[in-house]
Amino acid sequence: PAAYFYVADMLYRQFGDDSSIKERYPSMKRWVNHMTETKMKDYILVKDEYGDWCMPPESPELIHSEDPARKTNGEVLSTTVFYSILQLMEKFAQMNGLPADAEEYAALAIKIKDAYNKKFFNPGTAQYDNNTVTANLLSLRLGLVPDGYEDKVFANVVEKTEKDCKGHVSAGVLGIQHLMRGLTEYGGLELAYKIVTNDTYPSWGYMIKKGATTIW
């Protein structure tokens, strides 16, 4: 469902086409209200079934990881993404001339960010939840990290990727969307290059070596 909002915003940013934002705003608002009323508990979105889908398992013989430490908490994923949707809805409301809606979304986003950090952020280690790359990366790129902790959270992304994942792909379908962008934005260019050029498991190069014509 998040694609509904992201695509509308992408069309506007890339082409200046705001028709989707104008025409679809009422249905977007209904969906946000539905999620807030039925899937939120203490400002944490508890609706998530798939998690960071297809996080590379420990070996290519496995379909899914058997190690809980490699799995990102579904509430982390759903809450960070919902927070980013609220930021979009604040912008969409302003574009539609609805300042009251914009204020409502901004206020809700603040409450979610506060509750999220109280539940999942460890200020002593600058880690989110169980310190997966995806948990730290989404919190960072989607704007939930408390001021002053950004570099420390990013350092955890780098350390986890280099140490535990040996410089290989370290996220599933949700985290991977932010991995290359996050590394380049925060100065991890060499690590990004290493990940892209690896040809051992798990990596895109490994897929190519095995004859893949699409991403597994």
State where each predicted segment sits.
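Active-site core of glycosidic bond-cleaving carbohydrate-active enzymes
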Residues: 1-216
